[in-house]
Design a protein with these regions (language model features):
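The catalytic-center signature of Zn2+-dependent metalloproteases
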Residues: 2-78
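Pan-zinc metallopeptidase signature
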Residues: 78-89
């Protein structure tokens, strides 16, 4: 079956992903209390459901997809951002 992914879906995922890096995700200048950094892809999530997953900015992105690309931060990403906002990271 052919899966159509719109340019807008891809653009949103990439923009949110890069914005996450600008905010410091994942483990850029801090150490997360959560073990969610991919050891093979530094500063990226090991959760395929997170917009911070490494394949979002990779050619492998298209090979990894079996649906719409993730465009939201996962629970650990959001918790890291909240802890940074509170000055706890």
């Amino acid at each position: 079956a052919f899966l159509f992914i719109s340019a807008q879906d891809i653009e949103k995922a990439v923009l949110v992903h890069e914005y996450g890096h600008l905010l410091g995700l994942v483990n850029m200048g801090y150490t997360s209390p959560h073990d969610h950094e991919d050891p093979d892809h530094p500063h990226h999530s090991n959760n395929e459901e997170s917009v911070m997953y490494w394949a979002i900015e990779s050619q492998d992105f298209y090979n990894q997809l079996d649906g719409e690309p993730p465009n939201n931060f996962d629970t650990y990403d959001l918790d890291d951002l909240n802890l940074m906002r509170q000055g706890k990271l």
